[in-house]
Amino acid sequence: MIPRPADSLREGFSKWTDDFNEIRGLFSEMLEEEGDADLAAFLRSCFDDACAPRELAALPAEYCQALSIVFQLLDIVEENTANQVRRRAEDPRRQEGEPGLWLYNLSDLRQRGFSEAALRSAMDQTSVEPVLTAHPTEAKRATVLEHHRAIYLLLVERDNRRFTEVEAAIFRRRLKAALERLWRTGEIRSERPEVESEVQGVLHYLRWVFPDVVELLDQRFQHSWSAVFGTAPPNLPKLAFGSWVGGDRDGHPLVTPEVTARTLVLLRQGALAVARERLRQLGARLSLAESEVPVPEMLCDRIAILSRILGAEVARKAIDRNPREPWRQLINLMLARLERVDNADGYASASEWIEDFEVLETSLVEAGARNVAEMDVRPAIAQARVFGFHLATLDIRQNSQYHDRAMAGLLRAAGFAKHDFPNWSEAEKLEFLNRELQTLRPFTGPHMNLDPEAAHVTALFRELRMHLSTKGPEGLGPVIVSMTRGVADLLVVYLLAREGGLLVETEGGLACELAVAPLFETIRDLENSAGILDKFLSHPVSIRRPVNDVVVMLGYSDSNKDGGVLCSQWSLHQAERELTAVAKKHNTRLTFFHGRGGTVGRGAGPTHVFLEALPQGSLTGKMRVTEQGEVIAQKYANRVTATFQLERLLAGVTRTTLLHSVRPQGDTHELESIWPRVVEISFKTYRKLVETDGFVTFFRQATPIDAIEQTQLGSRPSHRSGAGTLDDLRAIPWVFSWSQARFHLPGWYGVGTALDWLRRERIDDWKQLREQVRVWPFLSYLLHNAEASLMMAHPGLMRLYASLVEDEALSARLFETIFEEYKLSESVIEELLGNSATRRSRLALAVRLRRGALDQLHQEQVRLLRAWRREPKEDTLTALLLTVNAIGMGQKMTG
């Protein structure tokens, strides 16, 4: 990878700090004009190096809100700066380029010897699907995000315009007004959001952001391909979107079958709205007249075909609307069929619709209007391929234990004497499932009284059956079984689906019309995953599935919470390698679904580096990846940023797929032989901590987890079943709590002891590790992520939060254990990688700019935690939640 030249970094840092100082100065000026001179002075003391910090006995609520807003402004400035720096890097005169994007990757692949034909083939094989999920600790309200976008667009306007003196003065007032609107908008949710409002949040991106982004993506791909190869580009690699919002019911009782059915309707309505809008835009542009342009026969033929399908009256209206303008006439006919999409004369599928688009494109090229075809119609085709008539696939996720209880309810209703299905052994379950999966006979009828779990699952599958029968399979993602512990957890879904009519008779026997996907989350489940998948793919019902693909989801969050970051990452790495071999054995195309979150403790990290670190041969062109709550807003709220993120993902998956295709599958690094022992030490170190007597007490008192559980940040409860145990706690609030207390423990704990053992006991291996750390992508990725967590941690604040633990002996003992591991982790990583602040200058600057203000907020949060735990008043909780929100903004993460 070619590093970006130092002068670009210096320019970027200079612009970042200058713009931040300017916009926060304007915010302070606005506060002073409103009579808040003391608050303005306080803000200067928090962010100006020249001003001494102000020590306050308590922070008023508006001070916390003001700090939160300044953090938001810093993020907006950083995003705009990054986009401007990338734009400059793409200037051919600078000869820099942006690593990870199409132009860079295509050039790199060509230099490596890949032919144009090989790349065209790879484009056909590549499929990338970001899956949008709700986030139980997403802190930003939709209204606040709208204000953020308005401010961002003002900064973009300023950078791309030359103002007169009058225009500059007016612009300054516009920016100040935008800041005032943000300042006067409440940030804390007054009540927990409904699932329906979260669905609308996802629809916003799918309906209003991504369609424009797809057009930009296609245009940038066309330019890059032509620049590298000088030939007509192939189609953009397949991009699709998925969603969990309205379909993910794991520990979420508010996601009912009715909510899922309504979500599918909303997604389809959104897709058709996007389609109509695109056709109308094309109709406005394609005014080519038959008197000026030769009309290809294929265009006339298609107009005649659609006219016959629609009937004389409808066709006449469509054609008469634009006499002597045949391209518009075809568009009018396409619009008419689109409006009748649920009728016999409407489009039966999106593929039919795309065929008509292709006629538009080809006929324009044939008529000599190639530029119009490439700039107007080709992006419309790209959009149609992405969104179809479904907008995004909706995944259905449920916990394996819930399915077991549902099965028990069905057995009870059917009169089985032995109906305690959750307590059966794996062998008993398999014997029963194999027998039952030979018949279409359901257990229950439509009007039988069922236990809640059985009633829910049966109603859900009936809704999915209805959708499949009327709309087709395109809008449905897989049924994901979280906490998959054995093959019975997957096969039971087939049997439950039978109750909804989703098992069908084929020539060879029964098959299920829904894809079923395991989700492996704990360390043990990852270790057993290959054996489970092998048995699943060997089952007759699986063999007869409609498509010879399988999706396997990997849980980064829970595996980290279970075994620590080093053990988690290695277990995932090994599982991918073994699962890939199983899929190859069954001649099945495997799609890994990476359940990565927004923090290191939940699998985050730069996309292109993450792809490089994947096991050889594990990426065969298809990838799904979660995009969660706060990450969705950070990556996709603004179109330029969204285009960059998706281009890097598409280009990166294409590049990695090609590189994997020419290297031996299972190819290992020479250092891997020592790694199992390192992982074992890390795992034991981490488990020793979380299993220590009193650890749960320490966690609950030294972090604001109890306050976080009171927030209204997301519709999902923070615990799966309400048990209140550490095992039952979701990974997101677990990570969020540690980040609020500035431990960032899930991102680094266990790394220090494990690598220090190598440094002390295996000196030659340690020396080799130091020499090769940057050429083993897996290790480099892991250590860089752990390093980032260590840079975000703050020992002084860690100690302050530990002082909240009532048992002083427990506090001292566990804090000392954690702090020693922190120092050890810092030591080994610095010895392997070098000085963090020097190498990670952007992150170091981000931490430095936020430090003074965050210190004030942490002090206030600790004070409020003491007061609230002593006397739980509502106004104290409200103030406490303001600090939770502000600290989350300040660290740019909510778990």
Enumerate the predicted regions with their spans.
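Catalytic or ion-translocation cores adjacent to nucleophile or general acid/base/metal-coordination motifs
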Residues: 255-286, 500-684
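Active-site cores of enzymes that catalyze phosphoryl transfer or operate on phosphate-rich substrates
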Residues: 392-395, 399-491, 495, 499-507, ...
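Generic, well-ordered alpha-helical scaffold segments in large soluble proteins
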Residues: 26, 209-227, 274, 278-285, ...
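Conserved phosphate/anionic-ligand binding catalytic regions in large, soluble enzymes, centered on
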Residues: 239-260, 376-403, 521-525, 593-608
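Extended, highly charged
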Residues: 2-236, 258-350, 354, 394-397, ...
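Acidic, glycine-enriched catalytic cores built around paired aspartates
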Residues: 2-68, 79-104, 237, 385, ...
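Extended, charged alpha-helical coiled-coil/arm scaffolds that mediate oligomerization and mechanical coupling
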Residues: 345-358, 362-368, 372-385, 390-398
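Glycine- and acidic
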Residues: 188-207, 257, 343-347, 359-366, ...
